[in-house]
């Protein structure tokens, strides 16, 4: 669909897209859960430094940033261990409680993204309270196909240079896919801070998949390796000039400078699908090893070394449809072992085992789809203490296809999340948040009730969506600042709990007044509050500001001799002032509003009726606006003594150039 030569009708096809973030393959228009789909073409046409950055502008999405290339996903105001990221069919486990490293996935290998909002799906268990981000690889080639492509990218602000090489094939049902990617960037700059020391990074990744695709199903083995070496932005300034302090005279160096990290993530996944007489059986086993080292005083000696082993398992059975009914049942979970091999440790060593079982049932009528299910989870955690957490969750939802153009979705879901090791046992400086953190062994599990109501409208000239949600969380865990100095130069934060309520909505409209012209706009809003609290502690910390986006896109050519799907687009991104913040003990501050303008052009290059390349040029923050995002962790670093401004600002103007070239395409 995404490479169609006539993208004018793309909005009419979206409701027919098959999504898999629910219990089985389901058309988007029949999904009771709120799901967004981002295609590979859309990902390639977005200016970003990583895959989370690429989807962060979707309605209801946001990101916590720490430096130049580090992003953590936020869905409807919730993130970290409240979101499950799925990649290669297994949940990504990379110590996601930390701010100083992102999701260890090569964005070049992501073929599409499904964003599941809320705890409406029961397949993922604890930690999926806010939703699920499913990063899907491109599908295997068809029988007899061999394909290869090369892509390259350059960004002007931080000198980011990246390339990726990929080859894949299918011969007699034997499938293979191999990829290598490399990316490097020097420090980014903005109008107030100049070049920001410690924001440079280097990323390398590899992937190999071998498997069999047969009439009985498939069996595939996948190996991935991901290496990220980011320096750490400390934000320290000269007391007289207010300028950021550098450890080197070369502000555009691609080399790592102290302090820096080394993050290495390895993964092996065995994915099996078997078609049975009355259904299908899916079985996936995965092993991951995450290694995170921090180097502070010497490039040869690490002070911090976290090593995390994770074994995941997932078995589920899905019946064939009978009389409009579908039934699914499954068992999944994981085993973990975390080791501290450095001199310093923020969290204690621990071992974890969890298991969960679920069952769902759905029924399709001519205009109605009903879906419901129940799940039980149990988690055992052993560190300095022994903890056991368990919870029962469930959901019930319906979709009413009122007519060909109008769908109405309703869903009520119960969510559950056990406290993570950082919340229970932290005791040290967390470089990603630039603060000293203290855990609390007395924390209880979080439970939530969330209700969703959505309306989708699609016609030849207009596509519109609006989705409302209300989320009530008991025992919501967050870090608040306390008046205690544990280490000089760092504020001290302690994890605590309260009852929370989140209300919000996402709305979007795409108008096509003429064949080539698209006028699009979205708005996202979430109000996150603690219940029965005074003004200073009323709002939950680090809640995304209301955001309005608008875009005018004109498609220049369709089926041209040399250019195909050529377009030019002008976009606006307005973040409103965030006055809803946690005021107690100066945990956070208000964030002023700001507006960014963007410009992009793109096209497919054609030779003899065949696509030979995709070209994209994008300019982000076109007017070079100086701003701080409310979710930037660098907002709370040192004050500039010369100007009185606190913290480090986000990236200034950035022009991005991308090219994707298919090297080989054969069919025998």
PLM feature segments, named:
Residues 1-16, 76:
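Periplasm-facing N-terminal accessory domains of Gram-negative outer-membrane beta-barrel systems
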Residues 603-604:
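Localized edge beta-strand/strand-to-loop motifs within extracellular or lumenal beta-rich domains
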Residues 619-621:
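Gly/Thr-rich phosphate-binding loop signature of adenosyl cofactor/nucleotide-binding cores
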Residues 60-64:
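A short linear hydrophobic-aromatic micro-motif
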Residues 55:
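Active-site-adjacent helical/loop segments in soluble small-molecule enzymes
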């Amino acid at each position: 669909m995404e490479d169609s030569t006539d993208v004018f009708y793309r909005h009419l096809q979206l409701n027919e897209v098959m999504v898999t973030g629910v219990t089985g393959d389901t058309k988007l228009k029949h999904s009771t859960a709120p799901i967004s789909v981002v295609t590979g073409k859309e990902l390639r046409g977005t200016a970003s430094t990583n895959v989370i950055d690429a989807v962060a502008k979707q309605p209801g999405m946001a990101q916590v940033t720490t430096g130049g290339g580090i992003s953590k996903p936020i869905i409807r105001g919730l993130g970290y261990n409240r979101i499950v990221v799925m990649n290669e069919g297994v949940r990504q486990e990379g110590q996601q409680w930390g701010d100083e490293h992102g999701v260890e996935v090569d964005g070049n290998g992501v073929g599409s993204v499904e964003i599941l909002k809320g705890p409406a799906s029961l397949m993922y268990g604890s930690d999926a309270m806010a939703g699920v981000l499913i990063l899907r690889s491109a599908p295997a080639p068809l029988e007899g196909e061999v394909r290869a492509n090369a892509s390259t990218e350059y960004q002007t602000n931080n000198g980011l240079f990246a390339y990726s090489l990929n080859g894949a094939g299918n011969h007699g049902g034997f499938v293979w896919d191999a990829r290598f990617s490399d990316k490097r960037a020097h420090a980014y700059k903005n109008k107030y801070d100049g070049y920001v020391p410690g924001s440079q990074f280097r990323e390398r990744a590899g992937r190999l998949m071998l498997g069999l695709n047969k009439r009985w199903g498939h069996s595939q083995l996948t190996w991935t390796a991901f290496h990220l070496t980011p320096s750490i932005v400390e934000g320290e300034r000269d007391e007289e000039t207010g300028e950021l302090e550098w450890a080197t005279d070369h502000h555009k160096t691609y080399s790592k400078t102290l302090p820096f990290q080394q993050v290495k993530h390895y993964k092996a996944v065995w994915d099996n699908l078997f078609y049975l007489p009355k259904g299908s059986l899916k079985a996936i086993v995965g092993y991951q090893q995450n290694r995170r080292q921090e180097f502070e005083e010497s490039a040869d000696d690490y002070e911090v070394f976290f090593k995390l082993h994770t074994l995941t398992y997932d078995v589920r059975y899905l019946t064939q449809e009978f009389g409009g009914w579908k039934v699914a049942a499954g068992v999944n979970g994981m085993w973990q072992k975390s080791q501290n091999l450095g001199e310093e440790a923020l969290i204690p060593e621990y071992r974890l085992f969890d298991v969960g079982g679920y069952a769902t049932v759905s029924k399709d009528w001519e205009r109605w789809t009903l879906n419901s299910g129940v799940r039980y989870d149990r988690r055992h955690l052993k560190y300095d203490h022994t903890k056991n957490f368990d919870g029962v969750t469930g959901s019930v939802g319906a979709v009413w296809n009122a007519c060909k153009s109008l769908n109405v979705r309703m869903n009520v879901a119960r969510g559950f999340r056990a406290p993570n090791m950082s919340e229970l046992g932290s005791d040290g400086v967390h470089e990603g948040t630039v603060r000293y953190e203290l855990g609390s062994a007395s924390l209880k599990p979080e439970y939530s009730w969330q209700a969703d109501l959505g309306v989708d409208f699609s016609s030849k000239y207009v596509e519109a969506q609006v989705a409302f949600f209300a989320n009530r969380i008991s025992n919501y865990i967050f870090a608040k600042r306390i008046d205690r100095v544990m280490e000089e130069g760092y504020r001290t934060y302690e994890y605590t709990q309260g009852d929370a309520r989140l209300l919000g909505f996402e709305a979007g409209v795409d108008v096509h007044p003429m064949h080539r012209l698209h006028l699009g706009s979205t708005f996202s809003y979430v109000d996150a509050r603690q219940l029965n609290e005074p003004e200073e502690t009323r709002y939950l910390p680090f809640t995304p500001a209301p955001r309005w986006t608008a875009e005018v896109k004109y498609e220049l050519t369709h089926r041209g001799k040399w250019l195909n799907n050529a377009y030019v687009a002008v976009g606006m991104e307005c973040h409103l002032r965030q006055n809803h913040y946690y005021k107690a003990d100066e945990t956070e501050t208000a964030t002023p509003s700001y507006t960014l303008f963007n410009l992009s052009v793109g096209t497919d290059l054609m030779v003899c009726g065949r696509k030979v390349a995709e070209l994209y040029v994008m300019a982000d923050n076109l007017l070079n606006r100086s701003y701080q995002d409310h979710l930037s962790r660098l907002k709370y670093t040192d004050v500039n003594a010369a100007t009185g401004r606190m913290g480090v600002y986000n990236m200034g103007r950035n022009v991005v150039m991308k090219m994707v070239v298919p090297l080989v395409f054969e069919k025998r």
